[in-house]
A protein has these predicted regions:
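ABC family nucleotide-binding domain
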Residues: 1-214
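Conserved switch/coupling elements of ABC/ABC-like ATPase nucleotide-binding domains
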Residues: 215-221
């Protein structure tokens, strides 16, 4: 996956705010890349565009050598549901549903029958260490457990790419380290590509590459 000349502007107060300013980036299959930079520099915007949650003002994203945004709205929805998993700083779990029901949801939205997705969801929750917590609602789980549910949910439709926006930002250092260990294990065992926006330098250093954003562009790579 790659970005070429990405520009993203937002209308604000009768004017325009430029967030991305001609950003170029390559993301190779199977690698784990950290995006770092000050708040407001465009990290979340970049992830939203890579995940087809938002469109660039100019520029293009190539996925399998095809221009992603040449797809129809239905094609973009299919891409989001089948090819990409999302993990956010705040887990965005549905509070009225159990952990298991939250993990099942992407499969149901993808058109699968509950009987076909239930076993897969249970296996994912067991994999992330929540075998005994499947029937608990989010309010009955710790912050680290909630994020584990969110990771299981992101894996439900077997994505090639996971976009994680500050996935450890709301956790203490111990829980953050455990969550990163889990993401790394998934990356290595399943070959899932990760693009992770983070302020945590210690976690970023454990990834394959780090890219630093300044003024809406990639300013440095390590």
């Amino acid at each position: 996956m790659s970005a070429r000349g990405l520009v993203k502007n937002y209308a604000m107060g009768g004017g325009e705010v430029r967030v991305l300013r001609g950003l170029d980036m390559e993301l190779n299959a199977g690698e784990m890349v950290a995006i770092m930079g000050a708040s407001g520099v465009g990290k979340s915007t970049l992830l939203h565009i890579f995940g087809a949650l938002d469109r660039p003002t100019r520029g293009e994203v190539l996925y399998r050598e095809e221009s992603l945004f040449s797809r129809s709205d239905a094609g973009l929805a299919q891409f989001r549901n089948r090819s990409v998993g999302f993990v956010f700083q705040f887990h965005h779990l549905l509070p009225e549903f159990s952990a298991l029901e939250n993990v099942i949801m992407p499969g149901l939205l993808g058109g699968e029958a509950r009987r076909d997705v239930g076993g897969r969801a249970e296996a994912l929750l067991e994999r992330v260490g929540l075998k005994e917590r499947m029937e608990h609602r989010p309010s009955e789980l710790s912050g680290g457990e909630q994020q584990r549910v969110a990771i299981a949910r992101a894996l439900m439709n077997r994505p090639e790419l996971i976009l994680a926006d500050e996935p450890t930002g709301n956790l203490d250092s111990g829980a953050a380290g455990l969550i990163f260990d889990l993401l790394r294990e998934i990356n290595r065992s399943d070959g899932v590509t990760f693009l992770v926006a983070t302020h945590n330098a210690a976690i970023a250093e454990r990834m394959d590459r780090q890219a630093v954003m300044v003024d809406g562009r990639i300013a440095a790579k390590f």
